[in-house]
Amino acid sequence: MAFADRLLAAWYAGHPALALLRPLEALYRRVVTRKRARFLSGESASYRAPVPVIVVGNITVGGTGKTPMILWLIEHCRRQGLKVGVVSRGYGAKPPQHPWHVQADQPAEQAGDEPLLIVQRTGVPLVIDPDRSRAVQALLASDAPDLILCDDGMQHYRLARDLELVLIDAVRGLGNRRCLPAGPLREPAERLGEADAVLFNGAEADRDDGFSFRLQPSALINLRSGERRALDLFPAGQALHAVAGIGNPQRFFNTLLGLNWQPVPHPFADHAPYSREVLSFSPPLPLVMTEKDAVKCRPFAADDWWYLAVDAVPSAAFSAWFDGQLDRLLPGRPRP
């Protein structure tokens, strides 16, 4: 297990040795708290877009199901007759310049895996730039969205936001509730109280402190042919290689177990690069990966490589709440 993986596991398990890092944690907390205070007071300037901006992010390190939720928000807004644009940091992407408009036929190395996935799945206009406010301005210069979704960027206060949605893994929660580097929190836990909504990935039902949502497997997609097959393509007990380079690989492996398959787990670092050689495992078995990994592997995929398509399914209460927020932010919006 790589050092980063061991550290992540320690954060969520609450390893006692992390107490040694608390002096650094105290310094980190002061820095991030002061940064936020500067923007809230107006001491540091934020850019406010002429259309509503909805930030979808988290305060923890590690995967929370953010990309599937963004896909759900895009499609939900479209069903309401709204045009949606997306901005993202584009973690790991190496575009020729910033800001960069992502197109569906660009390589993942240039566009970033998550932005490319979003564009390939939905076709929305999407701009990547570490400076999210600059990304929004570039998006508005080329398109006319009714609203903009900011993929992550919870801590990017240079971009003013009209709505904040925070996602949390319901199983791992906030770990030991410590800030970096003594724990997995990017901001103190009290920050959750300032968000407009908290969504718990994998919660059985809505909670007093937030809404629930789950990730529902929908199909197997062949990387080479694009063929879409039902989940009964593989019988119960099927052994297969499982590849996940996401923030929480175990969640993906657990999903495969829940489908009654027998995955041989191959966890990789989030946003990891791949090659045919790296993914040539023994014994020869079908290979199933996440959709996020698939956007990087299509150029060299084998015939028996598949990705598991998953869809976010939020609670009915969240859907109703979100529609109310759209009414507030866009009072003259079209009705379906």
Curated annotation (Swiss-Prot):
Pfam families named in the record: LpxK
InterPro entries, per the entry: LpxK, P-loop_NTPase
GO molecular function: ATP binding; tetraacyldisaccharide 4'-kinase activity
Catalytic reaction annotation: a lipid A disaccharide + ATP = a lipid IVA + ADP + H(+)
Highest taxon of source: Bacteria
Positions of transmembrane segments: none
Binding site for ATP: 60-67
Keywords: ATP-binding, Kinase, Lipid A biosynthesis, Lipid biosynthesis, Lipid metabolism, Nucleotide-binding, Transferase
E.C. numbers: 2.7.1.130
Pathway it works in: Glycolipid biosynthesis; lipid IV(A) biosynthesis; lipid IV(A) from (3R)-3-hydroxytetradecanoyl-[acyl-carrier-protein] and UDP-N-acetyl-alpha-D-glucosamine: step 6/6
Gene Ontology biological-process annotations: lipid A biosynthetic process; lipopolysaccharide core region biosynthetic process
Record's GO cellular component terms: plasma membrane
Function field: Transfers the gamma-phosphate of ATP to the 4'-position of a tetraacyldisaccharide 1-phosphate intermediate (termed DS-1-P) to form tetraacyldisaccharide 1,4'-bis-phosphate (lipid IVA).
Family indicated by similarity: Belongs to the LpxK family.
HAMAP family: LpxK
Name by which UniProt lists this protein: Tetraacyldisaccharide 4'-kinase
